[in-house]
Amino acid sequence: MANPRIPYVLSSARAPLPPLDGKRILVHLVVNVENWQFDQPMPRTIVTPPHGRETVPDVPNFSWADYGMRAGLPRILKAFASRGLPASTSFNAGVIDAYPQAAKAMRDAGWEFIGHGMHQKAINHAEGGEEAVIAASLDKIAGFTGRRSRGWLSPGLRETVDTPDILVGKGIDYVCDWVVDDRPSWINTTSGYLMAMPYNLEINDSIIYAIERHATGEMARRLEFTLRRFEMECRDSAIVLAIGLHPHLISVPHRIHELERMLDLLTASADVGFFTGSQLADWYAAAEPAN
């Protein structure tokens, strides 16, 4: 079965996209800020339990994520603020209650809030049903920030067959789950079109460090090679370069310098600009309107 939502087309056969604010490599910094529930099994682990038996509470693996929310996030905030860079956060709405200082710090920094469920749990397993969880999380973010989220990233990028239709019905303009191209695409839904915003499964600290378990430095190495390629390819069309970040991974003491080095590498390129998800969505909708 072919992709039922996004018709197939070679990227090279698509019409060129114009620069945005004079830039051809459009960087989207996406910080995944998650609420791992203390009284539930952890969504991911770094410490294997003795005898292979999971326990709840899972203190070491909960603490892994909790450290990121306490000590890691301030490092990311400082790295972005010191360079004047805009960012988006894919945001579990439960963070508002669990980590109120963190939520306020991101709001005060002007980050864009992308819906990411209530807790770090796949929406197809959510209690109360997918639509209810999507609605509740978006409403909670709107109440906290004073504005509706325009973007969505499903926890674990996991959807059901109905997710795009539900998202459009809740007023979402773009979703980051469909990583099919280096430029946005249009997703067919029962109620019109939804934008597939490029995300990244290659330059993503969760993939590199939590799943593939590479040594520190691998993420910067991949970014360097990607930037070299995009500096060539962006002559033909503007390109979106998303970078997926997690406070408990990229901003531990032995990796935060890697993030800083990556940011400096990007800012040194004349082709690179930094944008939020909404800025990218407005740019693409104007350049290539949905039919």
Label every model-predicted segment:
Residues T189-I207:
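A structural motif
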Residues A2-M195, A220-I243, L249-N291:
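Catalytic alpha-helical scaffold of carbohydrate-active enzymes acting on polysaccharides/glycoconjugates
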Residues E202-N204, I208-R221:
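C-terminal amphipathic alpha-helical segment
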